[in-house]
Every structure is written in structure tokens, then in C-alpha cells.
Amino acid sequence: DLTCGFGIDAYFLSQNFEEITLIEQNTELLDIVKHNWEVLGRKANFINQKLEDFLKNNKEHFDLIYLDPARRDNHNRKVFLLEDLSPNIIEIQEQLSDISTEILIKLSPLIDIQHLVSSLQNIYKIWIIAVKNEVKEVLVYLKKTENQPEIFCINLQSSEPEFHFNLDDEKHCKSEFSIPKKYIYIPNNSVLKSGAFNLVSEKFGLRKLHQNTHIYTSEEKIEHFPGRIFETEEINSKAIKKGEQFNIITKNFPLKPEEIKKKYKIKDGGNQYLIAVKSLSGNHFLVGKLLD
């Protein structure tokens, strides 16, 4: 682990390896990690050194290199571009490849997947990890391969299936479009983060509402979808009654949920959903329920 910190990631990684080496430049922090690992009965090689110095002087070869780059700059501002992280992954990627054939990097959920793919060499796999539909981490696994990177979209603490694909899959797909039908599908945020908008349409046989509305529809219910499924019907906005309760969702729509709530004098909550969306034919209000 080249970015030890408090050693939490390294502790769990170490359960899968016979030996682990931790690099940390902060002496006091490394002393804390040493103490914690002794208490937990876990052994490691502790090296109090700057990452750059370690890479320059190291003669060993490792089965796996792990990094979790710092996501704040010298002014404590959040950063997420690869070139702004510390260490700068783009600058050191060749040095990393010299000491291991497999490299695992944990990155911010804000990282742009296309930027990632265009900036790093030898991307083997990417995991986009969400917890309860909030993207928490992006993991990138570097290993020399002739294949296109595989992308895995995972929504933990949900019953939704994993969705995975390679980049060529998305490039060769096209979406077909439709007005809203009986069932509405909203992919979870790990899938949306991946950018596989056309592949979702083609793989599940769904129609998209609009190029910029990443919501899908079908007349028959499709099972095992990586996201939420709603059974809906379209209503005229004049049919929305004052004081009714809705969970409001807007996608590519002129009004935000708070503006809809204020305009139509409706309340949050209840079991019903009001979905305000834009299709190629115009704006729609859909009322329905979330299916299990």
C-alpha cells in the first residue's frame, strides 16, 4: 500500500496476501498504524518514506500495488482530476508498472470515466461502487491486456443485480425512443455514472424517452433491471389535486421538484410517485408506484 494513511484499506487487503508492505511519510501516523496492527495481531513491513523516494529506491517486485491518492490540494480544496491528485497517478504510472503487473487505485466518485480511460494505460477493470444508490468509490484495476476495459456497476445494500460491460459494447449500441409506456425504468447511479445509456436500452429491450433523459420505458415489465421500476400512467397536470402527497422525480424537465410542489400545492411523501419527464414528443406527468 503506497498511500497507507490509517491503514484501514491495507488491513482488509492484507487478509488476502501472505505479506504486505505499508508506505507512509508521516512518522506519527505510521506509529499509530504500527500500534493498531500489533493490537490486531497483524504483521506488515512498515516503511516511513515518501512515496516518490520509495519508487526511486525500491528493488522489490510485488504481486499488487494499491493506492488511495489524496483528494485535497495544498489549500484543502477537493480535487478529483487524476493530474491534481497526490500522488499524480498519470506521472507515476510507468514507475508503478515497473514494480508490479497489477495495480489497484481507489478514486473519487466524481472522477469522469472517459477521462480515466483516456488518461491511464492498461486499464483492465473499473468498478463503480454505490451504496443505497449513492456512488461512493471508483476502483480502477491496471493490468496489461489486449481487451477493452470491463466496467462493473454495483449498488450495495440493494437487491438490484450487478451490471457490467466493456467499452466497445456501448460504442456499438443505439437507443430507440418512445413516449412513456406502462413501465418506467430509472437506472441506479452506478449505471448512470458508467455512461452506458445506449447499452441499457439495447440489452433490456427498452425504449429511451429522449437523448438527454436517461429514463427508459416498456409496455411489458422487464425483470432483473439494475435500478428502480415504476408502474405508471400519464395524467394531465390539471388532474393534480391540491394537498395530494407524492414522491416527486424530475428528469430533463423545466421545473424542479420544489417548484412543482409549490406550483401545484402538493406535499412530499406517501406511496405514490409523480414523475415529470421530457420525451421527444414533449413534457409528461406520470403517476405511479415503485415496484419491488
Task: Spell out what each predicted region is.
Residues 1-292:
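SAM-dependent transferase fold signal centered on methyltransferase-like domains
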